[in-house]
Amino acid sequence: MKALRLPGQPLCEVFGFPINNFDTEAVHYRTEKLCPFNNRVPQCTKDKAKDPLGVCSIKEGDSAIVICPVRFRQSWKIMADVQSFLLPNATKSDFVTEVKLKDADGQAIGIIDVVLVETDQREVINFGALEIQAVYISGNVRNPFRSYIVTFSY
């Protein structure tokens, strides 16, 4: 991904759009603090639900580096890639997100981001789990993010 930027600004995407995109849709997403990348809810939830850090990617040289794991859900392409790797011969498959994992006593021990399942006549015959990770640097971009939002408030 090529980094689109404003001079001196380390951010590449805010609330799903390049920082130099000010069309109606981009402004709407920023104003409403929305996430266009298949988040579990329409709003961005990165860092804090009421004051989300809507930074999807930052610049590194001439490239953009994804810092939000939800960003990888764009058009669910990641699922097609994972299926071709984990279940290359599957003819019927589906996936579920945010699957709660419990221990032998039924106690919650975590959440799996995505479980891909291969089915045959309504039975699961194979599956694979996917944990999506991205660089997490909320403290390093909170100030540039706030500055951007204040400077380009609508």
Predicted regions mapped to residue ranges:
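Nuclease-adjacent, charged terminal/linker segments that flank catalytic cores
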Residues: 1-105, 109-111
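Residue-level marker of positions within ordered structural domains that often coincide
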Residues: 73, 119, 135
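Short, low-complexity, polar/charged sequence segments that are solvent-exposed and flexible
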Residues: 86-89, 133-134, 148-152
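Short loop/turn segments at strand-loop or loop-helix junctions that form parts
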Residues: 95, 100, 131-136, 141-142
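Short acidic loop-to-beta-strand element that houses the catalytic metal-binding Asp/Glu
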Residues: 98, 108-118, 127-133
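A solvent-exposed, charged loop/short amphipathic helix patch at secondary-structure junctions
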Residues: 139-154
